[in-house]
């Protein structure tokens, strides 16, 4: 049997005490379903009924390879067939979580990409309130790990891709690759070259495979159930990062052993910006449509400046056959927020980059957009924009798939992020506010204020939708769902381990950031 957590004794005892605290008999939701928020998008009405759950993973938990179980909020996907309501009224299911490239506060490391298998148990807390807050009622247990490799079985790496050159395999596009010194952690080792992955999006294939989107390429990869790379999707040329008129996959994120390894110029002249690649990925329930989206606008159409990069692109692929087919492309105008730390009003309005998308039963997409630099472990604790919103395409939405926009340096917007005439983006509709104080208080959580374990983390980057059982539904004309969202803790801990447990670290911030998870109740 796989261990629950390999972590410090204090964290384990604390976690088990919470599990016991929220267990119990059958629970019943209130008769009247409250409406905390509502939006209409693409002709569909969506209602938010409140925060239904909260869970954590200790910052020093490790997987079966002895590595810190961090970064798992980068993406999650739930096996829909596993999600069931138990006789006691609780819900259980299997989730897969995707860490990004590893702890990189002091530089990127030779961390092998992986997917983490988790079990989830949600025990409803219908009486939770600000006056009587519930303890964490979402139990998250670690089950297993699958390591990701290249087509030849060579482990992947989180080290920044080389500024020039790439790795080649028959039947694959040029792949981002890193030349590794020593063991890739600052010690002695064999070196070599590996495919660079900064994983950010995850979807489950109907054949048991894993679809993964990454920021370095930006590419989409398909891996077997055992973790071997089977396929790579290269986006149109406009997306590919270029420096000095040459393909350049580096994200200007030098390795820990060579902090001066910065490409020139630092920012790509066109294509995806550094660390703003394919942040979001989702697949339709029938397994035929794949959607992937950039975190923000490309450098030839508003990037890299945060106040201009609001025109992001959304790609749609047909994956029903043996080979994927690029079919549609759309513009998504991202929301903005006012950075209250900026003294210059002309520079204070910034783009809320998106961190995830999720296919909805209506055919619309949910999109997670947020500010950055605010939350637990940051210099400022109060976030002003952290939402799960809705985007909807219609017959009036412009399909921008064309040579004009997809060629090298092809642009849909000006350098200040203004869309070109004639382009109609998808409809964008604000929906669930993560920062709503009245809902957070039900679980003793808060946005802004003290830097304690109940302060929301900065980076919320994942979405997964699961159904509410018909016995618990209170909305007769709509379908009800739980929306599960994990935060990315960036592997920040004072008791960290990587390189199969051999590399020990303590983040210089002094913080221990638990992975936080929220569960929202909604209907559509």
Each predicted region: which residue ranges?
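Sequence/structural signature of beta-propeller domains
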Residues: 22-524
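Fungal secretory targeting signals
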Residues: 1-24
């Amino acid at each position: 049997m796989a261990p629950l957590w390999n972590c410090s004794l204090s964290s384990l005892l604390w976690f088990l005490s919470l599990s016991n605290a929220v267990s119990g008999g059958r629970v019943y939701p209130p008769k009247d379903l409250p409406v905390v928020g509502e939006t209409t998008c693409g002709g569909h009405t969506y209602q938010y009924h409140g925060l239904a759950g909260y869970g954590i993973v200790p910052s020093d938990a490790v997987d079966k390879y002895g590595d810190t179980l961090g970064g798992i909020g980068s993406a999650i996907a739930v096996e829909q067939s596993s999600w069931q309501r138990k006789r006691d009224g609780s819900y259980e299911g299997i989730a897969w979580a995707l860490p990004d490239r590893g702890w990189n506060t002091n530089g990127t490391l030779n961390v092998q990409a992986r997917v983490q298998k988790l079990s989830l148990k949600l025990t409803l807390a219908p009486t939770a309130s600000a006056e009587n807050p519930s303890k964490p009622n979402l139990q998250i247990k670690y089950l297993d790990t699958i390591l990701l490799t290249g087509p030849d079985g060579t482990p992947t790496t989180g080290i920044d891709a080389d500024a020039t050159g790439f790795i080649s395999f028959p039947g694959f596009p040029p792949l981002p690759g890193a030349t590794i010194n020593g063991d890739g952690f600052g010690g002695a080792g064999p070196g070599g070259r590996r495919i660079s992955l900064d994983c950010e999006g995850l979807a489950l294939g109907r054949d048991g495979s894993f679809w993964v989107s990454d920021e370095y390429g930006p590419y989409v990869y398909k891996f077997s159930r055992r973790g071997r790379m089977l396929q790579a999707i290269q986006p149109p040329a406009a997306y590919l990062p270029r420096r000095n008129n040459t393909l350049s996959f580096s994200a200007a994120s030098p390795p820990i052993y060579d902090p001066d390894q910065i490409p020139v110029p630092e920012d790509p002249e066109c294509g995806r910006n550094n660390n703003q690649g394919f942040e979001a990925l989702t697949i339709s329930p029938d397994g035929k449509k794949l959607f992937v989206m950039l975190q923000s606008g490309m450098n030839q159409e508003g990037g890299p400046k945060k106040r201009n990069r609001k025109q992001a692109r959304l790609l749609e692929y047909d994956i029903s056959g043996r080979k994927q087919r690029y079919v549609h492309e759309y513009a998504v105008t991202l929301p903005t927020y006012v950075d209250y730390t900026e003294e210059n009003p002309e520079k204070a309005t910034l783009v809320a980059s998106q961190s995830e998308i999720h296919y909805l039963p209506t055919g619309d997409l949910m999109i997670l957009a947020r500010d950055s630099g605010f939350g637990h472990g940051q210099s400022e604790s109060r976030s002003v924009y952290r939402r799960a919103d809705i985007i909807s395409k219609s017959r009036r939405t412009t399909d921008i798939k064309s040579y004009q926009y997809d060629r090298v340096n092809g642009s849909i917007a000006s350098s200040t992020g203004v869309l070109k005439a004639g382009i109609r983006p998808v409809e964008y509709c604000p929906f669930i506010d993560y920062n709503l104080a009245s809902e957070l208080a039900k679980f003793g959580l808060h946005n802004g204020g003290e830097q304690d374990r109940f302060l929301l983390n900065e980076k919320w980057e994942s979405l997964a939708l699961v159904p509410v059982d018909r016995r618990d539904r209170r909305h007769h004309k709509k379908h009800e769902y739980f929306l599960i969202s994990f935060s990315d803790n960036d592997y920040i801990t004072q008791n960290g381990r990587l390189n199969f447990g051999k590399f020990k670290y303590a983040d210089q911030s002094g913080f221990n950031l638990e992975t936080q998870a929220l569960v929202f109740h909604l209907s559509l």
